[in-house]
Structures are given as structure tokens and as C-alpha cells.
Amino acid sequence: MNIEVMSRQMAKRYAYKPHSEKTLVISITDPGSELNYLEGNKDNGIRKIVRMQFEDTDNPNTSISPAQAKEITEQVAQFTEHMDKIIVHCEAGQSRSAGVAAAILKFYTNDDTQIFDNPRYTPNMYVYRMVLEAFHNM
């Protein structure tokens, strides 16, 4: 499974360049920030963008909700066989996005070491558990 974790700035740069891979983007931003700064088109390869906002915390009241975790899993399940790549991004590309990416990898490949063994990432464990739980409840 080809999955990349990016910061918001890296995702913006990616969207402005041509790519041949059909890509699903999971876009995580802070509450209150701009949502529609990425666009998909035939040139950049982005076929679907799942947009959501939640804080980078383990507080159930402000972090990822069960409904958001379910939306991620449903979109990944629906588009995985039609996509060449999944990009997960958050503001810094280190915590929330890493938690989501690790959960996707764990569910589909049973191997999340690509994320957990990389010192660049500090996955948000609450996000990881919520998304993994949503996958198991599908």
C-alpha cells in the first residue's frame, strides 16, 4: 500500500504539480482553519479529498470523533482499490496524519512500522486507536 504522510504545506505543493498516480487525500486541519485550499484535478492526480477538522489532542471532546474516524475508514475502503496512493496530511505532518496513516497500514497490511519506526513521526495514539477501531467496526 502506497501511503504518504505530509504537512499542509507539502500537500499544497503536491497539488500544484502534475502526478500520474490516482490519489486519495485525507486532509486534516485545525478547527476554524481554511478547508478548501486543495483541489483535485486530472493533472495532479487527486481524485478525492476527505476534509475534516479536529485538534491534535487525546481529548475526546476536541480530537477526532467516532463519526470522523468512520468517514475516514469508509472513504479508504471505497477508494483503495481504485487509487494508486493515499496521502494523509495535517498541519505539521507528524501527529494526526501519522496516526491515521498508521491505522490504515495496520488494518490493510498488519504492519504500521513504516510510521512507528520513523523518528519523523509521533503518531497521535488517540487518533490511531479511533481509526483502527472504526476499521474493525466496519
Task: Identify the residue ranges that each predicted region occupies.
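Short, solvent-exposed loop/turn segments at secondary-structure junctions
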Residues: 30-33, 55-57, 93-95
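Catalytic cysteine-centered active loop of the rhodanese-like fold, especially the PTP/DSP P-loop
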Residues: 79-108, 112
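Glycine-rich, flexible N-terminal cofactor/catalytic loop recognition
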Residues: 1-47
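Short amphipathic alpha-helical surface patches that serve as generic macromolecular interface elements
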Residues: 69, 73, 98-101, 128
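Helix-loop module immediately N-terminal to the HCX5R catalytic loop
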Residues: 50-87
